[in-house]
Swiss-Prot record:
GO MF entry, a single one: flavin adenine dinucleotide binding
Bridged cysteine pairs (disulfide): none
Biological processes annotated in GO: tRNA methylation; tRNA wobble uridine modification
Source organism of this protein record: Delftia acidovorans (strain DSM 14801 / SPH-1)
Superkingdom of source: Bacteria
Residues at which NAD(+) binds: 281-295
Keyword Transit peptide: no
Identification of the protein by name: tRNA uridine 5-carboxymethylaminomethyl modification enzyme MnmG
Principal subcellular localization: cytoplasm
Protein localization: Cytoplasm
PROSITE patterns the record matches: GIDA_1, GIDA_2
HAMAP family for the chain: MnmG_GidA (MF_00129)
């Protein structure tokens, strides 16, 4: 049957990528259909019950700045919040939250069901409708055909998924869900470059069988015994601590030599070591057997016992992801302190799945081979909820822009971690599941969690992603930061007015000349609050107080203080960005035949011809493309007179002629 309604965007898959893609396209006014094999699993946290972390939290904040759902859902479902690297500089500080699986999923479902322009339909997709080199819709397993102008594919681990526990394996998309075998076969028919990856999950434990008195308690920030007691972190720029449910601690135990011996005794039945698993696993989230094998000299590994929610006894033992046989899982769990009598509710497993080489994507995440078909999430070779959500939003907004007949949007590497993520995938590809870290961003000083809204919300508003309520909150914050920064720069402190004792109390030493407040705030040990107490609050402003700005007050003060203290470093990084921008703005000709550039090595020519980077900047970051190769390519392009590369026109005196 051909469904009578036609859509602008069809999103296949309802995980973290799919939900953000569908919400983004619908917010932009496109008629959007979200197809999922099971509506009950929309927004499901398939692995660990947590959101955020180093690099990952930055992505969540950026998704939020563009109007996305993940941060708000985490504020509604978060049962523990922590600021990681809180003692370090603001560029590497990151928010991490434990989430109640049920509350998180319910929050996502609520947003989906109440989003205008968005329709849900429960059916697995078996086929894509393709006419010529363009996708025109999707076909479900019972033969319902939906026509659309674009399709966003966010299939997660479902494409030809296979679960492994010991030497036993079976087809599945995740535990309890069927795989997408037909869709995987169809994509292979389209001759898209494909490979296999794997990921894993630990056995889940019954909290009633855990002896927590033998474990170390780990309270969250704002909890009794935690950092900043009474002050709970918030993930969304429009969230607040009142949204959070009851907070819970995590617990810590450790593996030991006996645990390691038990794990080694199962190596001969491990699918990873016996060659049953072909896919490559995530380097930064290895299975426990991989850790014991690779780090044989380590006597123990930390294991975090994370609560799955407020209404369940289930715990997630973070650190023992495994595909070992169940009898080994049973023994290794019970060998650890506090877990001697632990009951396993669900066995751990590894899952293998298809992914497609992201180097075959355009910078909009549209496939090069099939027009209108976009990929996002684990299908692109990434791992993690946060990476998936960011890609989903990105693919969804670009599908919507294509439907509008507008140019694709891509933030630069100096504008967003999202830009770093996309650029890394389409230029370097993946050899293992890709995870975001702050170290992947060369301009991370200006890509902080705290300023994600300042970097992206205006762009989101221009595209139609940001609603009025978010825009109003952002505008108030932006204007307050600007006003307060200007006030500090124009307010002067005279040593004749401030006594040496008062100056020493606030500034650490007396001042000998006049300073403005902004310059005084640049001093390492002078905080905003302390500075405003100078001369009994003479220099404080009522405009940034909580009774005027409400929840925005703290973030405004934070922005002003960071701008002052890191001004020199930020200015230096802006200069670096300017120098790097030259290559980013040079677009490579679409018609260029790289095989006809004789100065380049055959390997470089082959790589450029196959992956066809869009800019010289992208080409410079491709694997195997050296700075020397880029110089030779520029010489070729200038000699050929290609647009943007032609030599400058000069007059007889050697000066640039005016147009």
């Amino acid at each position: 049957m051909l469904y009578p309604q036609e859509f602008d965007v069809i999103v296949v898959g309802g995980g973290h990528a799919g939900t953000e893609a569908a919400l983004a396209a619908a917010r932009m006014g496109c008629r959007t259909l979200l197809l999922s094999h099971n509506i009950e699993t929309l927004g499901q946290m398939s692995c660990n019950p947590s959101i955020g972390g180093i690099g990952k939290g930055h992505l969540v904040k950026e998704v939020d700045a563009l109007g996305g759902a993940m941060a708000l859902a985490t504020d509604i479902g978060g049962i523990q919040f922590r600021i990681l690297n809180s003692s370090k500089g603001p560029a590497v500080r990151a928010t991490r939250a434990q989430a109640d699986r049920i509350l998180y999923k319910a929050a996502i479902r609520d947003m989906l069901e109440n989003q205008p322009n968005l329709w849900l339909f429960q059916q697995a997709v078996d086929d894509l409708m393709v006419e010529g080199d363009r996708v025109v819709g999707a076909v479900t397993q019972v033969g319902v055909r939906f026509r659309s102008r674009t399709v966003v594919l966010t299939a997660g681990t479902f494409l030809d998924g296979k679960i492994h526990v010991g030497l036993n394996n079976y087809a599945a998309g995740r535990a309890g869900d069927p795989p997408a075998v037909s869709l995987s076969s169809r994509l292979k028919e389209l001759q898209l470059p494909q490979g296999r990856l794997k990921t894993g999950t630990p056995p889940r434990l019954d909290g009633r069988s855990i002896d927590f008195s033998q474990c170390e308690e780990q309270p969250g920030d704002g909890m009794p015994g935690g950092v900043n007691e009474g002050v709970l972190p918030v993930f969304s720029f429009i969230g607040n601590a009142a949204m959070h449910p009851r907070q819970m601690p995590c617990w810590i135990t450790h593996t030991n030599e006996r645990t390691h011996d038990i794990i080694r005794s199962g190596f001969d039945r491990s699918p990873m070591f016996t060659g049953k698993i072909e896919g490559v696993g995530p380097r930064y989230c290895p299975s426990v057997e991989d850790k014991i094998n690779r780090f044989a000299d380590k006597e123990s590994h930390q294991i975090f016992l994370e609560p799955e929610g407020l209404t369940t006894n289930e715990f997630y033992p973070n650190g023992i992801s495994t595909s070992l046989p169940f009898d080994i899982q049973y023994e290794l769990v019970r060998s650890m302190k506090g877990l001697e009598n632990a009951h396993i509710l669900r066995p751990g497993y590894a899952i293998e799945y298809d992914y497609f080489d992201p180097r075959s994507l355009k910078s909009s995440f549209e496939t090069r081979q099939i027009q209108g078909l976009f990929f996002a999430g684990q299908i692109n070779g990434t791992t993690g909820y946060e990476e998936a959500a960011a890609q989903g939003l990105f693919a969804g907004l670009n599908a919507a822009l294509q439907c509008r007949g507008q140019e694709a949007w891509l933030p630069r590497r100096d504008e967003a971690y999202l830009g770093v993520l996309v650029d890394d995938l389409i230029t370097k590809g993946v050899t293992e599941p890709y995870r975001m870290f702050t170290s992947r961003a060369e301009f991370r000083l200006q890509l902080r969690e705290d300023n994600a809204d300042m970097r992206l919300t205006e762009a989101g508003r221009a595209m139609g992603l940001v609603d009025d309520a978010r825009w109003d909150a952002f505008s108030r914050k932006r204007d307050a930061v600007s006003r307060e920064t200007e006030r500090l720069k124009s307010t002067w402190v005279n040593p004749r007015i401030v006594t040496p004792e008062e100056s020493e109390r606030v500034l650490g030493k007396s001042i000998e000349r006049e300073y403005n407040l902004f310059d005084l705030l640049r001093r390492p040990d002078v905080g905003y609050g302390k500075l405003m107490s100078l001369n009994e609050g003479r220099y404080a402003s009522a405009d940034v107080q909580p009774d005027v700005l409400g929840d925005l007050s703290a973030s405004v003060v934070e922005q002003v203080e960071i701008a002052a203290k890191y001004a020199g470093y930020i200015d230096r990084q802006k200069d670096e960005v300017q120098r790097a921008a030259h290559f980013e703005n040079l677009r490579l000709p679409a018609e260029l035949d790289y095989m006809q550039v004789p100065a380049l090595s055959f390997e470089v020519r082959q790589s450029l011809q196959k992956h066809r980077p869009e800019t010289l900047g992208q080409a410079s970051r491709m694997s195997g493309v050296t700075p020397a190769a880029i110089s030779l390519l520029m010489v070729h392009l200038k000699k050929g007179g290609f647009r943007g590369f032609a030599p400058d026109v000069t007059d007889a005196k050697g000066e640039e002629a005016s147009a």
